[in-house]
Amino acid sequence: MNAQETKQYLLQKETIDPQAQPIIHYANSSAKLAPTAAYPQGFPSGLLGNQASSKEVASVVSFEALGRTWKSSEYLYMLARWSTNDPANVAIQEDILSASSGYVIKRYKQPKHKRFTRPDFLDWRHEWMLWVVWQKCLSSAGFRNLLLATGDATIVEVVRLDPVWAAWPDENGCYVGANGMGKILMLCREALRTNSAPAIDTDKLNAAGIYILGERVQF
């Protein structure tokens, strides 16, 4: 799958039948599924999500990228909304980083600064999210192990009003939506298994000119 095919895959709406395939799902950072041999207290599927932060399990959700430690992938992902080379955006990014959790970022910080979001952000948000999650995979052994422990299951983020990143069960119990986060996790899982890397359109990301805390990110 090349970068263009990867983008098409991430955008494509799907209907996922849990009766036809094994499913690993999560709706929030505290979600747990049935116990397994490796996870006798219940498989912590919620730790797969972006909003799971270091207050849950730091060894799984925190990671290194761009020369610093991130409490969760939600922090780094969100900074790109305000990532032009503008001192005002550095102030916004620092405000985002002051949030106590990924939930606080999404619920309170994002709406506060929404009007300053880069107008081109939606053009490359999937590529950026894939890059962020892949950095997490490369940096965090705990997260890698958790992701690989999902086996061959289809991973689904379950959110009612987010058909881009998640999916929601219909009247037949099938999950409907693009499930972008679930797909990104599965792409990274496959890359880890095959000792490769997901197909990320780094040319698009470089062309966007993404600045994090005043430094341009080179891909």
Regions found by a protein language model. Give the residues of each.
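Charged, low-complexity intrinsically disordered segments
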Residues: 1-219
